[in-house]
């Protein structure tokens, strides 16, 4: 969808303040626990857990391969720093994956719900 299409589509919102934070957890139990804590603090409106991820990376000079659960935290820029700080403080990893992706466009009803859920 082009920018001009987004302007004419009544269900699209351009240049929202929504973000998606990517994070991995070592297992489903810790992923569910972290997701529930973040939702309880209203730092994210929704968290999607994607089990079955395999991550390969170097840690302390050694190639590691781990089963992980990918988490997708849906939030907004107003809550971004608090969300990142909270995850870092409550995550079982010493250095958790924390990547922030801006949401450029989206359905206006979903984005309205997302923002209302974070108030």
From Swiss-Prot:
Pfam families per UniProt: CutA1 (PF03091)
Cofactor (UniProt): Cu cation
Record-listed Cu cation binding positions: 23, 90-91
Cellular component GO terms, alphabetical: cytoplasm
Molecular function in Gene Ontology: copper ion binding
Cofactor note: Binds 1 copper ion per subunit.
Record's keyword annotation contains Cytoplasm: yes
InterPro entries noted in UniProt: CutA_Enterobact, Ion_tolerance_CutA, N-reg_PII-like_a/b, N-reg_PII/ATP_PRibTrfase_C
Xref: PANTHER family: DIVALENT CATION TOLERANCE CUTA-RELATED, FI09726P
HAMAP family the record matches: CutA (MF_01160)
Record's protein name: Divalent-cation tolerance protein CutA
Organism: Yersinia pestis
Organism ancestry: Bacteria, Pseudomonadati, Pseudomonadota, Gammaproteobacteria, Enterobacterales
